[in-house]
Curated annotation (Swiss-Prot):
This is Ribonuclease HIII. It is found in: Cytoplasm. Manganese or magnesium. Binds 1 divalent metal ion per monomer in the absence of substrate. May bind a second metal ion after substrate binding. Keywords: Cytoplasm, Endonuclease, Hydrolase, Magnesium, Metal-binding, Nuclease. HAMAP family: RNase_HIII. It is an enzyme of class 3 (hydrolase). Disulfide bonds: none annotated. Its EC number is 3.1.26.4. It comes from Bacillus cereus (strain ATCC 10987 / NRS 248). GO terms for biological process: DNA replication, removal of RNA primer; mismatch repair. The keyword NAD does not apply.
Amino acid sequence: MSNSIVIQTSSTVIEDMKQQYKHSLSPKTPQGGIFMAKVPSCTITAYKSGKVMFQGGRAEAEAARWQTVSQTPKTAVKKSVDSHRYAPPASIGTMSIVGSDEVGTGDFFGPMTVVAVYVDAKQIPLLKELGVKDSKNLNDEQITAIAKQLLHVVPYSSLVLHNEKYNELFDKGNNQGKLKALLHNKAITNLLAKIAPTKPEGVLIDQFTQPDTYYKYLAKQKQVQRENVYFATKGESVHLAVAAASILARYSFVKQFDELSKKAGMPLPKGAGKQVDIAAAKLIQKLGKERLPEFVKLHFANTEKAFRLLK
């Protein structure tokens, strides 16, 4: 029997949901709707009124992932994602900062990696000389070359959430936004302990959700970093600490990805496009469906598409 659950939430959470389900979005949106997404055994429809409907066999489980962050006021002023009390000061680019960033969240294959890096203000010219900039503008070869030098120059904390653990935590009701928040907080906490008694002038997180939502995700954590913590989208262009974190996170991700390809005995593509569906179908044929959780993020729509290719 098909279940149907409706929750009332904020526009911020709905934006988070849309980002979370971006690989499963339906081209059709009902009247008054913001988006419709179809994941295995559940259809999610978000409306401009703030209501979100979950329909299907997994409606209850899927809705539960969002109910913990949905208790926010119904009325919200529409503003820029960077318009909040956690915005960094104008002078942050010249300060001694811990920066954090993540890689792998949009890839079906491979883990999620988060890195926090401490950059002393005196090191900024050196990092520029090494070619540190937004990792999206660098190829894997350049990433490797710069990362190998960075590892000996800056203190850092690197965390890898492997696929099996990722899927296990996701099945327990943790959406991707929450997993990112947990890893960022942990990497920053680890790094602050590592560099003590040195205290950075601030912490800059490459913003992936509204700061208030980030802290809601961390509500049950014993240690949460709040002192001089700032959030900014495109953090790599705000401070080189985030750019360095992005490079080290991608370096770690590429290494993990190569290991995963060796384990699979076949090259695995990055991203979440059609080539990924084909590779996943081949992997299922080769190793069996029970091994799939070791390689992929199961909640992506690619899982269903891969199985469809095998029919």
